[in-house]
Amino acid sequence: MIGKLKGVIDEIAEDHAVIDVHGVGYVAFCSARTLGNLGGVGEAAILFIETYVREDMIRLYGFANQLEREWFRLLQNVQGVGAKVALAVLGTLSPSELANAIALRDIAMVSRAPGVGKKVAERIVTELKNKAPAFAGDASGTIGLKQELGAGAAPAPVADAVSALSNLGYSRDQAANAVAAALKEAGENADSAKLIRLGLKELSR
């Protein structure tokens, strides 16, 4: 089994990269995000690898870090999600953004990924809602909201407040942290307008 490749980029295509390791070219299928951040031909590269072995083929999937690889594995536990769909999701959302989307039941955000319809996005959010915190990475805002709301899904005012703050230019983590602080002050029954107002107050400190 191959767990990591360290070599020189020989080729970058639409859905894969070829990494030259001591004269041997390894084809690794990657998300669009990973390919975009990989660098140019001739540059050094490191990819964390998930190896799939079938009777008729061996396929390598490459990731920028181990967290992205863990999300790739986790996503495929969802019914209807294979390697191609998992890569599409990770190409659209970073691990932190995906953790936030699942915690906040933001189906629209997950369905932004190519080939991911509303039903698949709903399954991802529903089936992974209790597993996502362990894979949240740097999504501290998500963790804060989870602590405030418990294991259940975020109510609509919370999701609306996070979305509104994000639309104002704040990152999803900043927005989630601010809304978590607002919830502490206003309580779980606060409407979105109050959460946005208190969230902005928190962000201005």
Swiss-Prot record:
Please report a single Pfam family linked to this protein. RuvA_N
GO cellular component, alphabetical, reads:
cytoplasm; Holliday junction helicase complex; Holliday junction resolvase complex
Q: Report which superkingdom the organism of origin falls in.
A: Bacteria
- Which InterPro entries does the UniProt record give? DNA_helicase_Holl-junc_RuvA_I, Hlx-hairpin-Hlx_DNA-bd_motif, NA-bd_OB-fold, RuvA, RuvA_2-like, RuvA_C, RuvA_C_sf
Query: Where, per UniProt, does this protein localize?
Result: Cytoplasm
Q: Which residues cross the membrane?
A: none
**Region annotation Domain I: residue ranges?**
1-64
Alphabetical UniProt keywords? Cytoplasm, DNA damage, DNA recombination, DNA repair, DNA-binding
SMART domains from the xrefs? HhH1
Q: Name one GO molecular function term.
A: four-way junction helicase activity
Coiled-coil residue spans = none
What's the main place this protein lives?
A: cytoplasm
Residue ranges for the region (Flexible linker) are: 144-152
Q: Where is this region: Domain III?
A: 153-205
Q: Which HAMAP family match?
A: DNA_HJ_migration_RuvA
Q: What does this protein do?
A: The RuvA-RuvB-RuvC complex processes Holliday junction (HJ) DNA during genetic recombination and DNA repair, while the RuvA-RuvB complex plays an important role in the rescue of blocked DNA replication forks via replication fork reversal (RFR). RuvA specifically binds to HJ cruciform DNA, conferring on it an open structure. The RuvB hexamer acts as an ATP-dependent pump, pulling dsDNA into and through the RuvAB complex. HJ branch migration allows RuvC to scan DNA until it finds its consensus sequence, where it cleaves and resolves the cruciform DNA.
Comment on protein domains:
Has three domains with a flexible linker between the domains II and III and assumes an 'L' shape. Domain III is highly mobile and contacts RuvB.
For this entry, the protein name equals Holliday junction branch migration complex subunit RuvA
Q: What is the lineage of its organism?
A: Bacteria, Pseudomonadati, Pseudomonadota, Alphaproteobacteria, Hyphomicrobiales
